[in-house]
């Protein structure tokens, strides 16, 4: 037993710690303006540490069961407090005592079963109060709202338990913009309960029992401008005379939402209208008519009193026995002066011709989302029907032919605006007939693929949005507004087609760019909405947006709706913020710069080659490649000469008459290779030089000023230099025929200059006594 108790205690402790941990982790998020968000944070109590800096506090969707007297003490500057769906069942008497500046309080959908006037006594600045969805039966034991003199919006009641409304419940309230009372379980309504409120702009009353309708209606006749009755079952409603003689009601609009009616109860409701001489609009939303349209208003004065009603709106009317529905002939006279009729999404497929002819004052007719086809439309638009009609809306019906629809409507002489959008036309003929005064035409979402001359030339507003158009080339001289969004256009239409165009909406097409010329070609354009297209953020587009801010001001939605689609690195960025690379924006300048740089580089390389003998190195490379095809060292049988003699033609006398005689006639004789004598006729001279040097044991250079200036001597010196460099030997012999400076030998012949710097060279003596020694030394050098 002790073990069980111990285990239970541990579980309880862990649960408690878990709750505390969750509470500790939850926190408010507040911005600099003092707006604090604590929605859905699993708070079990009002968070601590609330300060005077808070202006708005939202703690909806939490688990706060109670509000203590000190929980909100620090919020002295709070303007809005939202506690919707927070599980609150208890509020202490002075919980709101510090909230004198509070203007907005939402306590809806909690568990408050008893309301206390002390909660609201300090809230002298309150403008909005929502008490819907709490399980109270009545609005407190004492009047709740005596001190709420600034209250503008009040919502009270619930679905299940709110059962009584008393005369004192709304005491202290003199004027409200909006009052909503949800009393679907109402069992008691004291007459005069709403009379204390002198003015209510909009009263919404959820009332399921029709027994209290007359009492509510009578109490609000002198104060309510717009009465909306919701969720009412009026099948058994019966009108009995009102006790009031009030005939100057300010009521302008009467609406029924989610109400059930019968033919008989509709007749009874008409009797209420004699008390609302200023009534202009009657509306039925989501109602059910449990009848067949056999309306038989019995009093002639009803017809007279209905004369000021200008607007009748019927939306989503459900008629279970619509197949037995009458032709409405009994109410023709009721609607003769009505100017605006909307019958939307109510399965209307036919309007009798006679009914249309009785609607002599009708200027606006909306039959959207019904079942009209051309055949029955022709019956509705018969000759003499709707003589004053200016606007006709047939959106989302079953129309198939634009041509036939236009022809049917020729009977409507005053028609200026036609909406036939969301019908399945698919195609457009080349020509059509339309009423002569047409100014507005809506063909959006009809599947058309091209715009042709079928469109009337009198149009000032045209909507062809959400179709399959790839171009627009129709001339419309009077067009002021063009709506062509969600198509497949790749460019703006030609401005010459619309000389007076003011507004164009061309969102979500395939437009990639536009230019100054395009926009400036629309002389009167004040608004162009082109966001949502696939813009290529090219340099031209960006330059246009930066350089022409006045034209950019025409772009509606700029800059947030204009995003780059390409290049990929800019995708998703605003066009205004995109920054392409220099390469993309200055290609011509960049190419010119590169070309100039290349020319300068070539000139620089040429200058360096000239200065550092680059051509010589190229020739050496060529010679090296040629020499590489041959063995580095020729076999002994290939050595044909003891020495190859390189000399200038100006020194030929000394070479041929002195040196050749001394060397070739000596014992043993030397075999010399001379270019005059031994070069192979017809062979390329450079090949002769290379072969002669390679077939010679030594290369003998007769250096003189003439040698340095000789071009062919330089070639021979070049290839000899290559051999010295490549084979790393001492095959070169220098003979100075006359004194010459070492620097006269080009710097590039580093090997030969090294020889002159490190080895003794032979110098031809002018003294005849020393010349014999010279020949001996020369023979020795050749033999080595």
UniProtKB/Swiss-Prot annotation:
Provide the glycosylation site positions: 114, 147, 414, 442
GO MF, one annotated term: NAD+ nucleosidase activity, cyclic ADP-ribose generating
Is Transcription a UniProt keyword of this protein? no
Q: How is it modified after translation?
A: Ubiquitinated at Lys-754 by PPP1R11, leading to its degradation. Deubiquitinated by USP2. Glycosylation of Asn-442 is critical for secretion of the N-terminal ectodomain of TLR2.
Gene3D superfamilies named in the record: Ribonuclease Inhibitor, Toll/interleukin-1 receptor homology (TIR) domain
Q: Where is this motif: ATG16L1-binding motif?
A: 761-778
A Pfam family name for this chain?
Answer: TIR
Where is the major localization of this protein?
Answer: membrane
Q: Which cysteines are joined by disulfide bonds?
A: 30-36, 353-382, 432-454
Q: Where in the cell is it found?
A: Membrane; Cytoplasmic vesicle, Phagosome membrane; Membrane raft
In the record's own words, the domains note is:
Ester-bound lipid substrates are bound through a crevice formed between the LRR 11 and LRR 12.
Q: What is this protein's function?
A: Cooperates with LY96 to mediate the innate immune response to bacterial lipoproteins and other microbial cell wall components. Cooperates with TLR1 or TLR6 to mediate the innate immune response to bacterial lipoproteins or lipopeptides. Acts via MYD88 and TRAF6, leading to NF-kappa-B activation, cytokine secretion and the inflammatory response. May also promote apoptosis in response to lipoproteins.
Q: Which family does it belong to?
A: Belongs to the Toll-like receptor family.
* Name of the protein in question: Toll-like receptor 2
Q: Which gene encodes it?
A: TLR2
């Amino acid at each position: 037993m002790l073990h069980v108790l111990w285990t239970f205690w541990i579980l309880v402790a862990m649960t408690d710690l878990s709750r505390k941990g969750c509470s500790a982790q939850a926190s408010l998020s507040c911005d600099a303006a003092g707006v604090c968000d604590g929605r859905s944070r699993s708070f079990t109590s009002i968070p601590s540490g609330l300060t005077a800096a808070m202006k708005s506090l939202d703690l909806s969707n939490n688990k706060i069961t109670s509000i203590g007297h000190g929980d909100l003490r620090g919020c002295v500057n709070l303007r809005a407090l939202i506690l919707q769906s927070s599980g609150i069942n208890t509020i202490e008497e002075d919980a709101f005592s510090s909230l004198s500046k509070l203007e907005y309080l939402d306590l809806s959908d909690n568990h408050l079963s008893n309301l206390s006037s002390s909660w609201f006594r300090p809230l002298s600045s309150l403008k909005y109060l929502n008490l819907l969805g709490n399980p109270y039966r009545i609005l407190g034991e004492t009047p709740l709202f005596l001190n709420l003199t600034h209250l503008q919006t009040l919502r009270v009641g619930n679905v299940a338990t709110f059962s009584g409304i008393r005369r004192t419940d709304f005491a202290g309230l003199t004027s409200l913009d909006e009052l909503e009372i949800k009393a679907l379980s109402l069992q008691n309504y004291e007459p005069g309960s709403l009379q204390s409120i002198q003015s209510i702009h909009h009263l919404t009353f959820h009332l399921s029992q029709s027994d209290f309708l007359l009492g509510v209606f009578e109490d609000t006749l002198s104060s309510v401008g717009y009465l909306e009755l919701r969720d009412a079952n009026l099948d058994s409603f019966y009108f009995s005379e009102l006790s009031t003689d009030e005939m100057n009601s300010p009521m302008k609009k009467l609406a029924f939402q989610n109400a059930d009616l019968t033919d008989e109860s509709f007749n009874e409701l008409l009797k209420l209208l004699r008390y609302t001489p200023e009534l202009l609009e009657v509306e039925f939303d989501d109602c059910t008519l449990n009848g067949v349209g056999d309306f038989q208003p019995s009093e002639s004065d009803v017809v007279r009193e209905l004369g000021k009603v200008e607007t009748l709106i019927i939306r989503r009317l459900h008629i279970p026995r619509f197949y037995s529905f009458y032709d409405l002939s009994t109410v023709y006279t009721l609607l003769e002066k009505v100017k605006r009729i909307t019958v939307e999404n109510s399965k209307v497929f036919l309007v009798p011709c006679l009914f249309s002819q009785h609607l002599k004052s009708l200027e606006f007719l909306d039959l959207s989302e019904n079942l009209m086809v051309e055949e029955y439309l022709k019956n509705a638009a018969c000759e003499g029907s709707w003589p004053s009609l200016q606007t006709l809306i047939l959106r989302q019906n079953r129309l198939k032919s634009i041509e036939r629809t236009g022809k049917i409507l020729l009977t409507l002489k005053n028609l200026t605006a036609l909406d036939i959008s969301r019908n399945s036309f698919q195609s457009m003929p080349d020509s059509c007939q339309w009423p002569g005064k047409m100014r507005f035409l809506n063909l959006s979402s009809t599947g058309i693929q091209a715009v042709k001359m079928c469109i009337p030339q009198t149009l000032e507003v045209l909507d062809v949005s959400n179709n399959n158009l790839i171009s627009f080339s129709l001339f419309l001289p009077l067009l002021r507004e063009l709506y062509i969004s969600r198509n497949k256009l790749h460019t703006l239409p030609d401005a010459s087609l619309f000389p007076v165009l003011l507004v164009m909406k061309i969102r979500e097409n395939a437009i990639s760019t536009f230019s100054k010329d395009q926009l400036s070609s629309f002389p009167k354009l004040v608004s162009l909405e082109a966001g949502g297209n696939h813009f290529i953020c090219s340099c031209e587009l960006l330059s246009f947006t930066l350089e022409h801010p006045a034209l950019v001001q025409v772009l509606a939605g700029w800059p947030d709706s204009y995003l780059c689609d390409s290049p990929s690195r800019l995708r998703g960025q605003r066009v205004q913020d995109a920054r392409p690379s220099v390469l993309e924006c200055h290609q011509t300048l960049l190419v010119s710069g590169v070309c100039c740089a290349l020319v300068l580089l070539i000139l620089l390389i040429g200058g360096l080659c000239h200065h550092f003998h680059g051509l010589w190195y190229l020739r050496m490379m060529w010679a090296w490649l040629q020499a590489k095809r041959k063995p580095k060292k020729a076999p002994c049988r290939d050595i044909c000469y003891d020495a190859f003699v390189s000399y200038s033609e100006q020194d030929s006398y000394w070479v041929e008459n002195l040196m050749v005689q001394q060397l070739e006639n000596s014992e043993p004789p030397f075999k010399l290779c001379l270019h005059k004598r031994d070069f192979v006729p017809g062979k390329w001279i450079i090949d002769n030089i290379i072969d002669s040097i390679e077939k010679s044991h030594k290369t003998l250079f007769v250096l003189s000023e003439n040698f340095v200036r000789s071009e062919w001597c330089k070639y021979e010196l070049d290839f000899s230099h290559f051999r010295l460099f490549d084979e790393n030997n001492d095959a070169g012999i220098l003979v100075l025929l006359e004194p010459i400076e070492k620097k006269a030998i080009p710097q590039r012949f580093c090997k030969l200059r090294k020889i002159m710097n490190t080895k003794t060279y032979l110098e031809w003596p002018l003294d005849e006594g020393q010349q014999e020694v010279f020949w001996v030394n020369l023979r020795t050098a050749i033999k080595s």
